[in-house]
A protein has these predicted regions:
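Extracytoplasmic small-molecule ligand-binding "clamshell" domains
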Residues: 8-86
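Short loop->beta-strand "edge-of-pocket" segments that line small-molecule binding or catalytic clefts
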Residues: 10-25, 32, 116-143
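Periplasmic-binding protein-like
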Residues: 16-20, 95-100, 196-234, 259-263
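Extended ligand-binding regions for polar small-molecule ligands
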Residues: 36-46, 105-119, 127-128, 132, ...
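Ligand-binding cleft/hinge of the Venus flytrap
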Residues: 39-47, 124-163, 192-199, 251
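Short helices/loops that flank or line small-molecule/ion binding pockets
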Residues: 44-45, 54, 59-72, 151, ...
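Ligand-binding clefts/hinges and TM-proximal coupling segments of bilobed small-molecule sensing domains
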Residues: 50, 120-147, 234-272
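Acidic, polar ligand-binding/catalytic clefts
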Residues: 54-127, 206-210
Length: 272
């Protein structure tokens, strides 16, 4: 009696980069980021695929998602109109604190004319001064922040393309080669501590006109395989995003924000 051949599983490539506290690829907390933990839970519950986790830069990850021959997913994507042309997105998975402006306190006087309370008028700051802003190439900082950056001349932006882009931008800032860095405070806080710096030397400013929270999605290649994967991922996220992910993210926040975040996270997905 002939035995039917075992059908090979499709290979799903998960694209990750070092993005603490979402994904942590090195050091004592390796694999303990909020999205690291989510990804492990998704993989465990998606046995229909062979899963590979691949480290890429943000720019390279976007290239791979655009390749119609590639079956790839990224668990840390923000929705943008441009990406929606070639990525099939999951429902929102995790609400995260929005990005903002990171400066060393010695540079604070330069910002004074552009502050409204703690919030910075980023567009006016970059238009009216000679200061350059460090950003990660290919990263979306939310549709609202992207809309501020898009019309600015390239001369005011210092783009970093490497694997450890934010860490390298902070190092440039510490050495005085760059005064402004765009980043997420939980990520920046983690990296400053990893570099042996003091948080007391830094100030974080939310950006005027930007919502307090933004939402990460899983995004897969917009192909039949990618769309099928997202259908399954959406089913799994319904419970994960309510019951599991908020606490995994909150542990990386400043202590005084943790309770407030967990309370607000209960309402993130009403109607979503």
């Amino acid at each position: 009696m002939a035995i039917a051949p075992v059908q090979a599983k499709e290979r799903l490539l998960w694209l990750v980069r070092d993005l603490p506290p979402f994904t942590i690829l090195e050091g004592a907390a390796k694999g303990q980021g909020a999205i690291d933990r989510m990804l492990a839970l998704l993989i465990e519950q998606m046995p229909e695929y062979d899963h590979d986790i691949v480290r890429v830069t943000r720019a390279r990850g976007i290239q791979m998602l655009q390749d119609p021959a590639s079956f790839t997913c990224d668990p840390t994507l923000m929705w943008t109109p441009e990406r929606a042309k070639f990525v099939h997105f999951s429902k929102p998975a995790l609400g995260a604190m929005s990005g903002g402006l990171v400066v060393r306190k010695q540079a604070e006087p330069l910002l004074a004319p552009f502050l409204d309370g703690a919030q910075i008028d980023l567009k006016r700051l970059l238009s009216d001064t000679q200061l350059k802003l460090g950003i990660v190439a290919g990263r979306s900082y939310s549709t609202q922040i992207d809309a501020i950056l898009h019309p600015l001349p390239d001369s005011v932006l210092s783009r970093h393309y490497g694997n450890d882009a934010t860490a390298n931008l902070l190092q440039m800032q510490r050495l005085g080669r760059l005064q402004l860095v765009l980043g997420y405070w939980p990520e920046v806080r983690y990296l400053i501590q990893q570099q042996g710096g003091s948080l007391d030397d830094y100030q974080f400013h939310p950006i005027q006109g930007v919502d307090r929270y933004q939402f990460l999605h899983v995004g897969c290649s917009d192909t039949p395989s990618g769309r099928a994967a997202i259908t399954h991922i959406d089913q799994l996220l319904s419970a994960l995003r309510q019951d599991t992910l908020p606490a995994l993210y909150a542990r990386w926040l400043d202590a005084e924000f943790q309770t407030e975040y967990l309370e607000q996270s209960r309402h993130f997905f009403e109607g979503r």
